[in-house]
Amino acid sequence: MNVIEISNIAAACGKNPYEDRQKIMLLLLCRKYKEIYKKEMKKIGIIEYISHDIKTFDTEIKEMYSEHKRNVTNPKEFKQIEKNITDKIKLKKEITKKDLDYAKIFIESSLKKDCGTNSEKTVIKKQLYTKGNNCMFSFVNNEYNWTIRGFHDATDNDIVIEIKTRMKQQNVRRNEYDLYQLFGYLLAMNKTRGKIVQYFNDIVYDSDIPTFTEFGIIDITVEPCKSKFEEFIKELNLFFQELNTYSDTHLINIEDIIKKNEWPIALYDTTDTPHNISPAYEKIINSI
């Protein structure tokens, strides 16, 4: 059975402009054929093995960042936090430009993710929602051999709430990929109504009716959402049909997905431990 996280559904259906459909396919194939894809990535040069005398600083960078992880709630804080950490890491004698480049990418990616997580708590408290993330919900499609699973953010009575923290005012908008993620939770939780709630600059956008920037309450039993939801199911089926054309002898073209200018996406030491993992490919590295 092929399993996909609900957070990856929009990309799998080709609706996420920031995450390629084939990349999600590669992730699932890496989980299924771990050693085969790891060996192939090593042969191509997508991952590199380093000798014992080469030092990496990713562990120290993560430790420095951990001081800020639980407290960041405002995108305006990002630049100062990044500067504080990079100033500290620059004091290390053996630090290289590559290490600093990795630090910048890791910090930027982590700040966005953790700011979103921390802001969810604020929104849930403000709006008096019932907090989610208390159990894993899943849905199994036996006909096409796939399972979706995930933890929802919150509920408001019978309405499933998906919270999105925006980094800029212009990002407060209706995104199709957010809608697809909500569809995934509705399917997994066996619910029919949901709402995408946005948060920016201490303002919660939670209109029940559609506006220029908000979907309002989504009801998959009523048009136009009913047809859109049916289309979503078809696209998910097509994704898994294509995924099943690959095997342990017929691999997906990795070089088409991970471009050469992004290599290496991780450095492996002599104990086979990965370091300097590219945040964009962290799930893939963790899968192998």
What are these regions (language model features)?
Residues 1-288:
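Accessory terminal regions of nucleic-acid processing enzymes
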